[in-house]
A protein has these predicted regions:
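A noncatalytic interaction/capping subdomain that flanks phosphate/NTP-handling catalytic cores
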Residues: 1-176, 186-194, 201-307
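Hydrophobic positions on the alpha1 helix immediately C-terminal to the Walker A/P-loop
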Residues: 183
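Conserved glycine(s) of the Walker
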Residues: 178-180
C-alpha cells in the first residue's frame, strides 16, 4: 500500500485530469485549476492512466463553491448525520456534512439519472486550512458506485474476495466481526494467493461470467486491490471451535447475500434488480456456510470442500 498521498498535477493555469478504475468502471475527474487535489493512499493502486484521454463511464467536474446549504425539502434518504440524498427528475443530489464544519455542507454532488455524469462542489470555507483534499473521498466514491451498480450493473457486498493458487475465486461474507480480516490474514500466509479486498467486494456478471472486483474500501487487514477474478464459490463465515463447510439452499444463500449487500434501499428499482441479480448468482455459484476456527488449516478445509 502506498505510504503517502499522490498529488495531482494542478496548476494555476490548467485543471487536473485523472482517471480511476474501480469495479470495472472508469471514473474520470476534472478538478478546477489550482485546486490542491490529492489521491488517498488507498486509491493510488486504482489509478488508470490509460483512461485519462478518453470518456470515462463516470465523469465528474470538481469545482469550488463560495457557500453551500441544505435544501428545504426533506431528503429521500439521510444517513444519520454524514450525508443525505435528494432525488428528482434531473438526477440525485448528495449533501455531505460533518460536525467539524458546522451545519453547512462541506461538499455537494449532483449526478444525472444514469450516474454517468456529475458535478461536485466543495465549500471553499470548509477547506481553507487544508493543503490538500481528495474530491471523491469516502463515502462519496462508494455511494456513487453503489447507485450505478443498482441500475442493472451489479452489487457491492460486505465480503473478503481472494484468488487461490489454482485460480479458484472465493468470496467470504460476513458482517463486521464475523472473521473476514482474520480469514484474510490466514490466506495471506499462503504462497500464490491474491487478495482483492478484506471488506468490500463488487460483484458483476460480464459475458456470462460472475466476477469479483477489489475495492479501495478495506477492513482491518488493510487489503485493497484493483484486480478482478471469476467467482468460483461463496462462503458465509461463522466462527466456531472447529472447521465445517455446510452447503445451504439457494433461497437461503440469496437472502444471506442480500443482508450483506450495499444498495440504495430508498430506490425501488434498485432493490428489485439486486434481488434478481442475487437470485441468479446463487443459482450459478455453489454457496455454503463456513464454520471455522482461526487456524491455518482453515485454508485446507476450504480447498478440500471445493476440490
Amino acid at each position: 500500500m502506498p505510504e503517502r498521498n499522490t498529488k495531482l498535477p494542478t496548476t494555476a493555469a490548467e485543471p487536473a485530469r485523472l482517471a480511476l478504475q474501480i469495479g470495472g468502471f472508469s471514473l474520470g475527474l476534472w478538478c478546477e485549476k489550482g485546486m490542491p487535489a490529492v489521491l488517498d493512499p488507498e486509491h493510488v493502486p486504482f489509478l488508470s492512466p490509460s483512461d485519462v484521454n478518453g470518456a470515462c463511464d463516470l465523469e465528474f467536474d470538481i469545482s469550488w463553491a463560495s457557500a453551500l446549504s441544505l435544501p428545504d425539502a426533506a431528503p429521500d434518504f439521510a444517513s444519520g448525520g454524514l450525508w443525505s440524498a435528494h432525488r428528482d427528475n434531473t438526477g440525485t443530489k448528495f449533501y455531505f456534512t460533518s460536525p467539524v464544519f458546522g451545519s453547512e455542507p462541506y461538499k455537494a454532488a449532483w449526478l444525472d439519472p444514469s450516474f454517468s455524469r456529475g458535478h461536485v462542489l466543495l465549500n471553499r470555507s470548509s477547506f481553507q486550512s487544508h493543503d490538500s483534499l481528495f474530491p471523491l473521498e469516502y463515502p462519496m466514491d462508494e455511494l456513487v458506485l453503489m447507485h450505478r451498480l443498482a441500475l442493472g450493473e451489479g452489487v457491492e457486498v460486505h465480503a473478503l474476495g481472494l484468488v487461490d493458487q489454482d485460480s479458484s475465486g472465493y468470496l467470504f461474507l460476513g458482517h463486521s466481526g464475523a472473521g473476514k480480516s482474520t480469514t484474510a490474514r490466514l490466506w495471506m500466509r499462503q504462497p500464490g494467493v491474491r487478495l482483492l479486498s478484506d471488506d468490500r467486494i463488487i460483484l458483476r456478471r460480464q459475458n456470462g461470467v460472475y466476477r469479483m472486483y477489489g475495492t479501495p474500501w478495506h477492513g482491518d487487514a488493510g487489503v485493497s486491490s484493483p484486480a478482478t477474478a471469476p467467482l468460483s464459490a461463496i462462503f458465509f463465515l461463522e466462527q466456531a471451535p472447529s472447521h465445517q463447510v455446510v452447503p445451504i439452499s439457494q433461497p437461503q444463500a440469496a437472502a444471506e447475500l442480500f443482508a450483506r449487500a450495499f444498495l440504495p434501499h430508498y430506490v425501488k428499482s434498485g432493490i428489485e434488480f439486486t434481488l434478481q441479480f442475487l437470485d441468479q448468482l446463487t443459482r450459478s455459484i455453489p454457496c455454503s456456510i463456513f464454520r471455522f476456527a482461526p487456524t491455518d488449516d482453515a485454508v485446507e478445509a476450504i480447498r478440500h470442500a471445493h476440490a
